[in-house]
Amino acid sequence: MNQPKKERFKTSVGGQALMEGIMMRGPKQMCCAVRKPDGTIETKLDPTPAHGVWTKIPLVRGAIAMIESMIVGYRYMMYSAQVSMGDDYDPEEEETAFEKWVGDHLGKKAEDALLACAAVLGGLLAILLFTVLPTLIVGGVNHFVTLGRWAKVVLEAVLKVGIFLTYMVAISKMKEIHRVFEYHGAEHKTIACYEAGDELTVENVRKYTRFHPRCGTSFLILVVIVSVFLYSVLPWGSIGLRVLFKLLLLPLVMGISYELLKWCGRSDNIATRIIRQPGIWVQHLTVFEPDDSMIEVAIAAVTPVLPEDPEDGRW
């Protein structure tokens, strides 16, 4: 009698590659591990932010998760840059005069608000590059060569995907970013090893794939693809109005993309394999093979955040 196939365990534990380090996020704690110039690994533990009611509402939680990820990621990226340069992390030492004034007069909430603004500003620049620019280019082309509605839709889609891929290729050629993408690979391999039930050692982690279906890169390419389909129904009468509609629909685009990512992470069938395949392809640009020292950092980052009962961290 054939035994039913055992479903592979999938964890909600995940992370982010940093400058010479990795941040791992578990159900209760987050840990940032950074390789210092002297070869040692410095770790920093923080409680995982509490999830409010909004994070449980489908479609809404996608945009919230994206914004939270940007803010937390920016904070840890700054921390890792400081530690990897050889200085002990001291927030007071690295504060500018303006930041110190804000902290002294307005308190920590104002500092957090400034950090959020910095992260959101980065997001707005990305929106300008991947959402607004393709529409403006199509509008410019249409000024010289009259295009039909679907010609505009196709051209905008090609431009959007082209700009996205060109951006990824360009930044992957930068030495510092290339190392971040190698740490990205170490993060994926470590999670895969944990999900397989193997002991977290360098030898065990090394043998696992660097590609992961629930990667942030997969989410980004889903956002691009979903936006192509959703924005195709918007009017082209006014370029300014079209850009406005696209910006208003962006939270919905992120929400749909997030739900698709969660579905693909939980299910394994023909539909989910097709949906997640573009993300795996693009990971060839953002996830590289790590060396053993990077795997050591990933293990140091993930070990403190793993729940005692793996079921508490099930995806």
Cite the ranges covered by each PLM segment.
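Juxtamembrane "helix exit" motif at the C-terminal ends of alpha-helical transmembrane segments
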Residues: 122-147, 223-247, 251-254, 258
